[in-house]
Every structure is written in structure tokens, then in C-alpha cells.
């Protein structure tokens, strides 16, 4: 690679985060524009945003088979993700899991801005990369990073193994 482009072992995760934010934003726009569009004649776009988000969210490759966890999925796909970060179906699968986390705590979207603050985190293991992200986040938005870590280590969405909620088998809504 040349110029300012940095090869990252965890680019696949960034791709999934971008897709998650896109899906989350589509859903937010649908809700917001339904009641308060920026211009009155734009209100008609709300259902189109919602339908598009639902169509994307409903794609079967975005969901785990019942009984599997994200942690298990990651263990099976770790090598291929690191070597080929643009595998759309794998990125979209993870994006759906991350979107579920964002929907539970919409105020934590700002945590994404703290990813990659430590330049040395690019070459760390994925676990250390996530821990670096967590430590860079201000305390009031660290919860999102912790939930992501929990997703990869235990497979749950809420940060506690006892109350694991894995988005499996189909759309969560």
C-alpha cells in the first residue's frame, strides 16, 4: 500500500461497523422523517427507508443458525476475515449483530469515533485492538465497546453471559 493508506488486520471489523451505522441510520431516518421530516414533502421517504432497512435486515446470511454464537462464528472465520476484509456477507452478518447493539444504546454511537485512536492498535491481536478501543472511549460511552467485546468473547449482546441474547435465526423485530 502507498501514501497514507494503512493496511489493517482489523479492516473487516471497520467495514462491519460502517454497515451497522448505515443500517442503524436508515432505521432512525425512517422513524424521524415519519414524524418530523426536514421538509414536509420528504415525509414520503420514511416508508422507503424503513422498507429498505427491513429488506437488508431480513437477508438470511445476516443471521446465525440457532444455537450458535458470534464468538463461535468469529473463531471459525478469524483467519479469512484478517486476510480478506471485504467479504460482504460476513461483514453484513456482523453488521446486523452490531446494529442490534446500537439499537439498545443509540447514545453510544459516538464510541465508534474512538476506534483506532492508538496507532499501535492496528497491529495488535483483535482482542487487544478491542481493548485499546475500550480504553480510549470516555467512560460514559464505554458500554458499547464492552458489549462488542462481550459479543466476541461470549457471544452475547448485553455484556453478561447469564443473560446472553444472540440475534439468531432471523430478524430481531
Language-model segment annotations:
Residues 4, 24-28, 101-104:
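Active-site catalytic microenvironments for nucleophilic, acid-base chemistry
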Residues 9-58:
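Post-HExxH zinc-binding segment in Zn-dependent metallohydrolases
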Residues 59-173:
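Pan-zinc metallopeptidase signature
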Residues 1-4, 20:
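Catalytic glutamate of the conserved HExxH
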Residues 3-12, 84-85:
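Second-shell loop/turn segments in exported
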